[in-house]
């Protein structure tokens, strides 16, 4: 029997909705990265974008364990003396709290051209509203998968 290698015609993408309220960030990002990549499917092909489209709501209510809220996120502007930093708490309370979730998922994917293509299948929203009702996404309950996935405030 030959090894199955998926072609674009073989791939069927589903829409998945995940509520991130009270979910631990790293565990959420790990589950989402697996779904985006398509590794949960028996027809997984490493060089193809065979994952699902994932919509995450309530990204501003994600939980961080330990002292990770006080850890800084650093970046460089490219100019001399352009090192910048913000704590994760500042980002979550700021204008774009969904960037914490997006960055966590991005860093759990391989750093190549395919992962940049895969990241276009991720949509993250800070509130509970999202414009993807027409796709009728299937709800994935991350909180019931494992008791360690949630943390109270």
UniProtKB/Swiss-Prot annotation:
Domain of life: Bacteria
Biased composition, class Polar residues, residue ranges: 143-153
Keyword Ribosomal protein: yes
CDD domains: Ribosomal_L13
Keywords: Ribonucleoprotein, Ribosomal protein
Keyword rRNA-binding found: no
Subunit structure: Part of the 50S ribosomal subunit.
Protein name: Large ribosomal subunit protein uL13
């Amino acid at each position: 029997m030959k090894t199955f290698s998926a072609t674009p015609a073989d791939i069927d993408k589903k829409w998945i909705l995940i509520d991130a309220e009270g979910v631990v960030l790293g565990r959420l990002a790990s589950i989402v990265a697996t779904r985006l990549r398509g590794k949960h499917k028996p027809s997984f092909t490493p060089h193809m974008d065979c994952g699902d489209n994932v919509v995450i709501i309530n990204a501003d209510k994600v939980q961080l364990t330990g002292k990770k809220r006080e850890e800084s996120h650093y970046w460089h502007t490219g100019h001399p003396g352009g090192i910048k930093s913000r704590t994760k708490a500042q980002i979550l309370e700021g204008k774009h709290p969904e960037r914490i979730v997006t960055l966590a998922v991005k860093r759990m994917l391989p750093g190549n051209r395919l992962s940049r293509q895969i990241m276009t299948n991720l949509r993250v929203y800070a509130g509970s509203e999202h414009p993807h009702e027409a796709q009728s996404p299937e709800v994935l309950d991350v909180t019931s998968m494992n008791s360690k996935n949630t943390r109270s405030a």
